[in-house]
Amino acid sequence: MTPPESDVRPENPTVRRIGGRYRLDERIAAGAMGAVWRGTDELLNRTVALKELLVAASPGEEDTLEESRQRILREGRIGARLQHAHVISMFDVVVHDDRPWLVMEYLPSRSLAAVLAEKGPMGAREAAAVGEQVADGLTAAHAAGVVHRDVKPGNVLIAEDGTAKITDFGVSRAVDDVQLTRTGMIAGTPAFLAPEVARGGQPTPASDVFALGATLYAAVEGEPPFGLDDNAYALLHKVATGTVRPPVAAGALTPLLATLLAPEPANRPTASQARAALEAVAAGRTPTGLPAGSAFALGPAAPP
């Protein structure tokens, strides 16, 4: 794509700029729907991340393209509400060549999914330290009336110093937003959905808490609580039953996973309660004050 004249500086005509101030330096990630660039805000002289919508409409797919545009704009609006140490900050939204771009905080990091793929499962206390930060970010989101709806290892970024931040609010929902997901479609990643969402219910803060539990289960066990299946419909059926396989390597995290993954939303802790419990596990203490609901029968907890 050739940049418009207004976004090309005479001294280097090959440099791409978005919105007249954001220089694209390197594409660092790409998927079917979009790409993420490392860039420079030349006005403030800081490194930023820019998210680009890549979808091109084919005949008959104009609705899909418009839905994608609206989703990325919604991500920008929701991100602007959330200024928190464990949520990737949103700085700006720019429409360029009729495509929305999100300008976000750049965090040199890898996703939790990438960390697990390289290093294998975590120990209970290490996973709890990550989960505590994610729960802290979710607490802020829920207080702002935002449900993330797609908490999973791929949407948790881990910096070199161990800082964890939630990213990708593209399918999240604010209480005052219009519904963008078409009737009959489920937003989120099947392996990490709460059972009530897999059955067609509306996502709630409690379903985010379940997804947090599923993420931590995957972090210590090596795969999600309902396993993996290339057949998304078969996997959704498993998730809808709410029957979780008891973990074998979760150690001191086991009792907390049991309540985070409780089949009934009312039996799960809030994100704030989960944060406090995860802080305790990370510090080697026993969490207290959790709901009585459990996803599986509990024996004696294994050591951390």
Language model features by range: what are they?
Residues M1-N12, G20, A56-E62, A219, ...:
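Proline- and threonine-rich low-complexity intrinsically disordered cytosolic regions
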Residues L24-A32, V36:
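Protein kinase glycine-rich loop
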Residues L54-R81:
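AlphaC helix of the eukaryotic protein kinase fold
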Residues V93:
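Activation-segment/catalytic-loop signature of the eukaryotic protein kinase fold
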Residues D97-S111, V115:
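Conserved short submotifs of the Hanks-type protein kinase catalytic core
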Residues V130-G131:
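Activation segment signature within eukaryotic-like protein kinase domains
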Residues D208:
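Conserved catalytic-loop aspartate of Hanks-type protein kinases
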